Amino acid sequence: MTTIAVVPVQRLSTAKSRLAARLAPDERRTLVLSLLDHVLTALNAARQVDAVILVSPDPEVLEHAARRGAIALLQPGVGLNEGLRLGRDEALRRGADTLLIVLADLPWITADEIDALVAALPERGIALAPDRHDHGTNAAALRPPDAIEPAFGAGSFARHQAQARSRGLPLRELRVQGLAFDIDTPADLEELAGHAPVGASSDESGT
């Protein structure tokens, strides 16, 4: 099995705009790159991941990721799901039979949690890691890589579940702290500042 991870990152000039009331543009840029570094470090340490593709329309992000061992893929347009489809196609071209999608704003993600998500995959199907509110999807493992279409954004967890059901695909759901906690709002920043990173939980459920 060949598992390739795809990490999408938008332009630094527009990233984390919901934090604009709390952070200046330079501070948001620093935060985005710091979170990305942590995610790439975890992916590089994961035993189940063979390669990492970083998709972005921002040349600075691509250069930053390439220095950390990622395959840098320029996204001609904009849009999270457009970038993920581009990354998926590149992963297929490189021989992937399993696609791992991981968002770039997970400050507590660990290599063990990444491995657990891939290990949760059935022979053919999907494994989802929702955010802590069960609204969004922070990571997804797909076998084959085009098992479902990426539908990330607000409410994506329900959309991905619905796709799996409509296609008759087995679905597993993994809820662990490092995959569930993302940085979107000032409240998230406050929680991050008030808590030290913790190790992976073993909680797992499947449907």
UniProtKB/Swiss-Prot annotation:
Instruction: Report which reactions are catalysed by this protein.
Output: phosphoenolpyruvate + GTP + H(+) = enolpyruvoyl-2-diphospho-5'-guanosine + diphosphate
Q: Please name the Pfam families in this protein's record.
A: CofC (PF01983)
Example of a GO MF term: GTP binding
List residues binding phosphoenolpyruvate: T137, G153, S156
- What Enzyme Commission number(s) apply to this enzyme? 2.7.7.105
- Please give the pathway this protein is involved in: Cofactor biosynthesis; coenzyme F420 biosynthesis
InterPro entries per the record?
A: CofC, Nucleotide-diphossugar_trans
Q: What enzyme class is recorded for this protein?
A: transferase
Recite the UniProt keywords alphabetically: GTP-binding, Nucleotide-binding, Nucleotidyltransferase, Transferase
What domain of life is recorded for the organism?
Answer: Bacteria
PANTHER family named in the record: 2-PHOSPHO-L-LACTATE GUANYLYLTRANSFERASE
Q: Which HAMAP family does this chain map to? A: CofC (MF_02114)
Spell out the family assignment given in the record's similarity comment: Belongs to the CofC family.
What is noted besides the main data? The exact nature of the substrate is currently not known. This entry has been annotated based on its similarity to Actinobacteria.
Its annotated function is as follows:
Guanylyltransferase that catalyzes the activation of phosphoenolpyruvate (PEP) as enolpyruvoyl-2-diphospho-5'-guanosine, via the condensation of PEP with GTP. It is involved in the biosynthesis of coenzyme F420, a hydride carrier cofactor.
Please give the name of this protein: Phosphoenolpyruvate guanylyltransferase
User: Which species does the entry assign this protein to?
Assistant: Sphaerobacter thermophilus (strain ATCC 49802 / DSM 20745 / KCCM 41009 / NCIMB 13125 / S 6022)
Lineage, uppermost ranks: Bacteria, Pseudomonadati, Thermomicrobiota, Thermomicrobia, Sphaerobacterales
